[in-house]
Amino acid sequence: MNVTSIALRAETWLLAAWHVKVPPMWLEACINWIQEENNNVNLSQAQMNKQVFEQWLLTDLRDLEHPLLPDGILEIPKGELNGFYALQINSLVDVSQPAYSQIQKLRGKNTTNDLVTAEAQVTPKPWEAKPSRMLMLQLTDGIVQIQGMEYQPIPILHSDLPPGTKILIYGNISFRLGVLLLKPENVKVLGGEVDALLEEYAQEKVLARLIGEPDLVVSVIPNNSNENIPRVTDVLDPALGPSDEELLASLDENDELTANNDTSSERCFTTGSSSNTIPTRQSSFEPEFVISPRPKEEPSNLSIHVMDGELDDFSLEEALLLEETVQKEQMETKELQPLTFNRNADRSIERFSHNPNTTNNFSLTCKNGNNNWSEKNVSEQMTNEDKSFGCPSVRDQNRSIFSVHCNVPLAHDFTNKEKNLETDNKIKQTSSSDSHSLNNKILNREVVNYVQKRNSQISNENDCNLQSCSLRSSENSINLSIAMDLYSPPFVYLSVLMASKPKEVTTVKVKAFIVTLTGNLSSSGGIWSITAKVSDGTAYLDVDFVDEILTSLIGFSVPEMKQSKKDPLQYQKFLEGLQKCQRDLIDLCCLMTISFNPSLSKAMVLALQDVNMEHLENLKKRLNK
């Protein structure tokens, strides 16, 4: 009987008995080798089949390069595998236990803390659940490398299986992201091993790689007599292994190792002059398996975690504006805030000083056509029964929301008027391109300021190096930078609301957005509730939302939600409503009717309203006043 017919019968038998598929060329070569080993003695077909199977068990399937698993199985995120597949285990690890404790156990090291702790480790109670084993297998059919996970306990598998063991997986096997979920009914151990894998995938070596321990490397250190003395690194008694301190030290030193196969090979055989060399052990050294040094860890990027929904989808400019607003509010708490300007000799300064008790303040910074800066600071004071509060200082033209930037000199128009035996100065400062930045909108306006004529004096100082102004304002004074009250349509700014310091609960409209949620959505007493922090770009405010708003966003009231749990379809709609509510809160930027309680420094959002053309017209009218 010729080799081809014997190979054909052996192939049929392997497939029928063991579901093993092999390439015909390998099978014929294997039969020829078996016949030569038996001195060309005629073997029966059964004997030949048995010896072929034994040779297959000892063969590295990577050498056969015979594909078995379906094409593209690693690219499919989720699926099911059907049929019979004879695969090879390259390595396996119990991932339910720490790799460090496993490797110390293999080396016979005692790592318990009984000698240094006051109490011995507490033994688990009989009724406590014991941690179950979970093996992670590295499998291959010779072409595809895939992982297998012990999804349910498989008694026939254990960590002592030698690398190269062949197993048969069969039946319906689910897989996720390149990992086969193995169960007892899906696995059969066929046996075998591969000598070439015994060292590379030894259990201790696999665990050592997991904890970042380097392979055995020979390093050379020169001495003072120009002789190179080789030193074997980490070559210890395999029964004991390195101590805990040495292992930790080796992990640090691993950052400085370099993986260069050529130079490493040379160091294994010669380490200096011919008359001063010491032979080194190299039985376990294989250049192709030297672990590359771990890259030095990059400093982790700082991340800001926002509560409940990650409502941080704002631009950098908005964030900077909010930060400046917070700083401005902190400055408002001071009663007296000096303004100090450092100037060069070539700057001209005009100071308008007046002498009442309380003040309204604004600062004008103008840029002339010749690019020289001219700073004009107006300080005004009005009598108001010793009641005063501090105004924020203007540090520079970029930080202040009270700044007016223009490209032409300011024209001053002084008009004197008599009213109730008191004469006021009206200073009207106009510019063709005056602009005022507030809430990220450029508001063109004329700044009109009323000051008293009595005791007024105007002085020009060209050689001044330091100017200090004391700024005060009364509780009832008008904020000239905004020129509005709490009920000016279409909305009011939160900073104006805070500065007015209302004595009782006040209901106003603001145009704001949610900065972050400060609490979870909850139901109590049959109503929805959630807390948040809102801002309009000038200030922050903690708010609660009324039940009606949340019910409209979710689409379900609390009683309806409880009722929907009995109906799967309704409950699914409720879950969709929750997701819609989350999206709406993230994108929420509209007019909010809020009820502000000054005693709690908190507000209740009563209604939401989109901005329409009427609001736009009201805003234009307010700006043109």
Swiss-Prot record:
Region named Disordered: 257-282
Gene Ontology CC terms: nuclear body; nucleoplasm; nucleus; RecQ family helicase-topoisomerase III complex
Keyword list, A-Z: Acetylation, DNA replication, Isopeptide bond, Nucleus, Phosphoprotein, Ubl conjugation
Organism encoding this protein: Homo sapiens (Human)
Modified sites of kind N-acetylmethionine: M1
Protein's name in the database: RecQ-mediated genome instability protein 1
Cross-link Glycyl lysine isopeptide (Lys-Gly) (interchain with G-Cter in SUMO2), sequence positions: K334, K387, K426
GO BP: DNA replication; double-strand break repair via homologous recombination; glucose homeostasis; multicellular organism growth; reduction of food intake in response to dietary excess; resolution of DNA recombination intermediates; resolution of meiotic recombination intermediates; response to glucose
